[in-house]
Amino acid sequence: MDFGALPPEINSGRMYCGPGSGPMLAAAAAWDGVAVELGLAATGYASVIAELTGAPWVGAASLSMVAAATPYVAWLSQAAARAEQAGMQAAAAAAAYEAAFVMTVPPPVITANRVLVMTLIATNFFGQNSAAIAVAEAQYAEMWAQDAVAMYGYAAASASASRLIPFAAPPKTTNSAGVVAQVAAVAAMPGLLQRLSSAASVSWSNPNDWWLVRLLGSITPTERTTIVRLLGQSYFATGMAQFFASIAQQLTFGPGGTTAGSGGAWYPTPQFAGLGASRAVSVSLARANKIGALSVPPSWVKTTALTESPVAHAVSANPTVGSSHGPHGLLRGLPLGSRITRRSGAFAHRYGFRHSVVARPPSAG
């Protein structure tokens, strides 16, 4: 618009007849409020996402949520910045209006000038008012120019302040494939419910309906036997090995290292030879036998009187040949009470006895 072509009455009238800078100031305050709300929303979103993904929620779902929410948080931050900028531009437009309003000539001044000019012209009978009329017209021209300058400046400032950067559309945070999958699932639901209802009507009391029975019925007896043997042979072999090992632990070789006795039988180990033949068990308190500092049951050791033989006996003693045959049991351990009772006369325990490694010579006295 060419404001210079318009008289000051129009330009000043427009400036003084409008609503003023109030609407622009209200718009600036509104944009500032929107910027604050968007900034708080972005901060809240970022805080919640950081808290959720920090410790309690991890995995694929958490990563998917972060990937979907992060662009939206960025958009909120960008929108908050744009809203704040819009508020600043609205405030600038209001300031431009105030500046133009101050520069604009008030309409009453223009009206007074026009009235003065008309009065001077009406009373200028002899040309005595010509100079006053020229001064009044010059003042009016200045008013014209002043209003035109004010309006041109206001138009330029308001145009620059009202040039807002367009807001970007919010990003899409949903997965379009999920919508398609949901539609497909809803479409398939009636058929699924129908199949479930038909499956529920099947009578399960008939053994032929069991899949295992049908499977076993479709193979031959030989194949079934093979399956059972393959499945159970490892457990059967292990059990048999443990059984024979337990028997072998309670048997011994026969005399002379043979594997059988005189009657072809295996010998039981001495540890189990007296099972069932020992005396009744008696119990007493603080009456245990002692082997050194060790307390032992009464049936373990029966102390025999040991006397030292003279040196001559030790020198001329004839070594005795032990039994050439004896049991060689698989189990070793402490002798049982019945065995000690029967064989206590054959040998004497030498617990605590001091052995002589080198015989004392006769010359030593």
From Swiss-Prot:
<dbReference type="GO" id="GO:0052572">
    <property type="term" value="P:response to host immune response"/>
</dbReference>
<dbReference type="Pfam" id="PF00823">
    <property type="entry name" value="PPE"/>
</dbReference>
<dbReference type="Pfam" id="PF12484">
    <property type="entry name" value="PPE-SVP"/>
</dbReference>
<comment type="similarity">
    <text>Belongs to the mycobacterial PPE family.</text>
</comment>
<dbReference type="InterPro" id="IPR000030">
    <property type="entry name" value="PPE_dom"/>
</dbReference>
<protein>
    <recommendedName>
        <fullName>Uncharacterized PPE family protein PPE25</fullName>
    </recommendedName>
</protein>
<dbReference type="InterPro" id="IPR022171">
    <property type="entry name" value="PPE_C"/>
</dbReference>
<dbReference type="InterPro" id="IPR038332">
    <property type="entry name" value="PPE_sf"/>
</dbReference>
